Amino acid sequence: MVLGNIIEKYTPSKETKDLSEYYGLTSDTDVALICNNEVIDTKGKLVNGEVYLSYETVRIYLNARFYWDPNENILRYTTANDLISVNAESSDYTVNKDTQSFGQTIVKADASTAYIAIDFVKQYSDFQYNYYTDPNRVVLTNAWGDYTIASAKQKTEIRYQGGIKSPILTEADKNTELTILEPGDTWTKVATNDGYIGYIKSNKLGTTSTTTISSDYVAEEFSHITKDYKINMALSLIHI
């Protein structure tokens, strides 16, 4: 009996984590969002095979310059030279007065918010994304810079939390590259390229190195007025 308890104590669990629960998915149209190696609370929507992001998600995580007018059901975006406008449920958009086709519905609106096609957002924003299925999820990146990485030395489990009794999120094959989030002596918190954030035994990781993630997005430049003298902003009070 004692021996059996000891064996049970040191035997790794084979239980797998319910991924819908892990990502907070409640319907087939929900899309989990992983932004800069963090599973965020808000969800995207899958409509006719295309990913849409809520207006709030776009503003908070990707580009605060989009503006949704719920009264007119119009999405607007301003560049240095252009005003872009999109009517809800339309596949067309206008750049100033020129109408262009996007090839799919750009904005889906309901009573509470608007959902914007992710590819339309990307057209005007500095981020990268990859979409995965089983379950539906999008991995977003817009935090550019250096990251610490290491490869799995052998096929091994990535668990929900540190500890051999924690459920398995996914498996990492030998030589799978992982991003190190929180190194530890026994367990290390890692992120996979396809959107799992969990823990791996530290002795299953190879030597760490640094990789640089960069963007090829060309940001637009806004012109501004410059003067070679000071401008007096004092208010003039007129008494009648």
Feature map (PLM): residue ranges:
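A short macromolecule-binding patch
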Residues: 194-204
